[in-house]
Design a protein with these regions (language model features):
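Hydrophobic alpha-helical targeting segments used for export or membrane insertion
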Residues: 7-13
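Beta-propeller folds
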Residues: 9, 20-430, 438-439, 445-451, ...
Length: 742
């Protein structure tokens, strides 16, 4: 339906312009048909820093064009027409999933025919298009179909390296010869990529790096022998069950042995870096070549993850040099924004050593550590740098923990931190900055404003032109007459917690309404943010039924509130969260008389499902109905890296694991509880649900349960799943938590 017709329909529903709230249709909410926003899509800045490229559909001819835009004036040029992305053997176009440029922008690597590996489509086929002669050919043709992973050009664009079936290969683009660099890859020896737990918890997928001179490949190797193997049963796709086996180290058990080494692109033996420490009880989550050098910069975490040791290893040697250690009594994080300064004399480093997360400048020998940002606020992430002006651009939000803004600071010398984002745009700002720091694609949104995307220039954050204002989506949102998300505060003891709230349709402040609380509550996420979330249409749908939507940010959540806020929960995950949720909703009821404390519901997914259970079991007088989805019932069941980071091992902290696990308090259930889990969840295993069910049955506790066959942690695969899930949730709320004002 075109916008004019859609708007007419809405106005008719509104009774000729009334601002009454439209009754949302759940099918349309799930299908994403109600508010449609436009974005930039995938883009890449080109090496000149003045142009960026995008993949765009060629509507007239079909297929995909690679198009460049000049940042200054939006001059558009088709760099590679869709007609070049054709398989000459078949005459058919090759679908473009994504592209990557060579360093000199002379060639493009095309990723296609992709397959999912756990979370993402990281396995597929690759083709190379050479702009000099317009040739287009597939690489790795001798390997099995859709088996290549993480292909990337050598620095001089003469070769491409890739992983296939746990081995690393290098293909010469001129001679088309292929050199196999590793030969020991197997089910248990993994070269150039990672096992399940490194991928999930360290975001490690691409496991090899080209040396700057193109003569060596450095890579990770994981030996999963001895790691516990988890079995998932597929009962729905064949007459007899199929078993999926994969190594999964649960808290306190044996990890894979991980090491790093380097090998010549001409072949030969791998030189392994001799980093001290048991490879099964230390982690190597990050490794990169220092720019324009033959040296590797390696981060090593100990198993408790409370120290991060930095090593430099030179090609030609197996002995690394230890230069720097960051440590914390709770845990430290890996550094993903390392930038080298002044001809590699210094590098940037993020640390919470001052009590706040800040960016530091560290000398190459690790002896001189100076703050680049400082103050009682958290640096969040680096956006880019202007090396000529000696500036770093970064995200922070000193005055409002739910928002995000761009700031700048000097890399050397003293100077005040300067806000760059416009003062009149309250919400969250994100940026894709050019390599020179001169231009950036800027996206602004807040809870009631769809993304507004413009090109800005620096210095000065000047808006050069609008790229997408999403005016149509804004009009669609406003035409619905939805209640806005409000941001308020609630107390938990002496702490002030951030809270967001949506009031029901036809709200009457003199009546009392039931509340549905959405919780996550664990260190890996945050739920109270002033950012566009598609209009919060699922929550708005439930609000339409006569509920108040609430989310409370408890201690330990990943909010920019300082080290103590985030790490006070160390060793006690699951304890403070439910305490803050209970205190928070009670304080809200003291502030707002329209909250009905006799009708409080709570729901969450993953860690939020765990906290839902903790709240239901430990505070049954506060929480009366709960829906727990894809939850961890016993913290011992989850993986080593995540659980031990925040809890240490079960052997070292048995009481913390007992107190933080919902299953410990299952006998406390008094209210209505719906358990939802996918049997194909490789992340939080269905075992977690079954163990809790077993315990609830033992205690004679009544509950409801929905199991989704072979759905993963997101419970979205297979036809009809998402709609069925949301319908089931809505039905349960309406049947067990009476809606409407009283």
């Amino acid at each position: 339906m075109k916008w004019t017709g859609w708007l007419t329909a809405i106005l008719l529903l509104l009774g000729g312009g009334s601002q009454a709230q439209v009754q949302l249709n759940l099918e349309d909410v799930v299908a994403g048909k109600i508010i449609q926003t436009k974005g930039m899509g995938a883009m890449s800045w080109l090496k000149d820093g003045e142009h960026y490229s995008r993949v765009e559909a060629n509507v007239e001819q079909g297929g995909t064009d690679i198009v460049s835009y000049r940042a200054k004036d939006n001059t558009r040029e088709v760099l590679i027409p869709a007609s070049l992305f054709v398989d000459k053997a078949t005459g058919k176009p090759v679908p473009v999933r994504s592209i990557s440029w060579s360093a000199d922008n002379s060639k493009v690597l095309v990723y296609t025919n992709t397959q999912r590996v756990w979370r993402y489509d990281t396995r597929g086929d690759y083709w190379v298009l050479d702009l000099s002669d317009k040739s287009f050919r597939q690489i790795g043709k001798d390997r099995p179909e859709s088996s290549l992973m993480f292909a990337k050009f050598s620095p001089d664009a003469s070769k491409v390296a890739y992983v296939s079936e746990n081995n690393i290969y290098v293909e010469d683009l001129v001679s088309q010869s292929v050199k196999q660099l590793t030969t020991d890859g197997s089910e248990t020896i993994v070269n150039g990529t990672f096992d399940w737990v490194y991928e999930e918890e360290f975001a490690c997928r691409d496991g090899f790096r080209w040396s700057p001179d193109g003569q060596y490949i450095a890579y990770w190797q994981s030996d999963t022998e001895g790691t516990g193997v988890f079995d998932m049963i597929n009962n729905v796709d064949s007459l007899y069950p199929k078993i999926l086996h994969f190594p999964y180290p649960k808290a306190g058990t044996t990890n894979s042995a991980v090491k790093v080494g380097y090998v010549s692109v001409n072949g030969g033996a791998t030189t392994w870096i001799d980093i001290p420490g048991d490879p099964r009880n230390n982690y190597i989550p990050r490794m990169e070549f220092i720019p324009n050098s033959n040296e590797l910069f390696i981060q090593q975490l100990n198993r408790p993850q409370n120290t991060n040791k930095v090593w430099i290893a030179k090609i030609g040697s197996s002995k690394p040099e230890h230069i720097f250690t960051d440590e914390d009594k709770a845990w430290v994080d890996t550094n993903d924004h390392i930038r080298w300064l002044k001809d590699n004399q210094y590098f940037t480093w993020e640390s919470e050593r001052s009590g706040w997360r800040h960016l530091y400048r560290v000398s190459r020998d690790g002896k001189d550590i100076q703050p680049i940002t400082a103050g009682d606020f958290d640096y969040i992430s680096t956006v880019g740098m202007d090396m000529k002006k000696g500036l770093v651009y970064f995200i922070a939000s000193p005055d409002n923990f739910t928002q995000r803004y761009l700031y700048s600071a000097k890399l050397f010398g003293k100077g005040e931190v300067k806000r760059e984002s416009p003062m009149d745009e309250a919400g969250q700002h994100s940026y894709s900055m050019s390599p020179t720091g001169k231009w950036a694609v800027h996206t602004f949104s807040n809870a009631v404003t769809p993304p507004v995307i413009d090109m800005v220039s620096f210095p000065g954050h000047k808006s050069v032109r609008m790229i997408e204002d999403n005016a149509e989506a804004k009009a669609q949102y406003q035409a619905l007459g939805l209640r806005p998300k409000e941001f308020v505060k609630a107390k938990s003891g002496d702490l002030m917690l951030d809270v967001c709230m949506i009031k029901p349709a036809n709200f009457d402040p003199n009546k009392k309404y039931p509340v549905i609380i959405e919780v996550y509550g664990e260190p890996a996420g945050s739920t109270v943010q002033d950012v566009w979330s598609g209009g919060d249409l699922w929550n708005q749908y439930m609000v339409n039924q006569g509920y108040i939507y609430v989310s409370i940010e408890n201690r330990g959540a990943n909010a920019p509130r300082g080290r103590e806020w985030r790490k006070c929960i160390y060793g006690e995950v699951g304890t403070f969260a439910c305490e803050d949720q209970a205190r928070g909703i009670q304080d809200l009821a003291r502030q707002y008389s329209f909250i009905d404390l006799s009708r409080i519901g709570i729901t969450g997914w993953s860690g939020g499902g765990s906290q839902t259970l903790n709240c239901m079991f430990r505070y049954p007088s506060v929480f009366h109905t709960g829906i727990a989805i894809a939850f961890v019932s016993d913290q011992r069941l989850y993986d080593t890296i995540y659980q031990e980071r925040y809890m240490n091992t079960p052997q070292n902290n048995p009481e913390g694991y007992r107190k933080g696990s919902p299953i410990t308090y299952a006998n406390g259930l008094e209210g209505n509880l719906l358990l939802i889990h996918g049997t194909g969840d490789d992340n939080v295993h269905y075992q977690s649900c079954e163990m809790l069910v077993d315990k609830l049955v033992e205690y004679g506790k009544m509950f409801s349960q929905i199991s989704y066959p072979m759905r993963s942690h997101g419970i979205y695969e297979r036809k009809g799943t998402t709609l069925h899930l949301r319908k089931s949730m809505a039905k349960y709320w309406l049947e067990h938590l009476p809606a409407g004002g009283k």
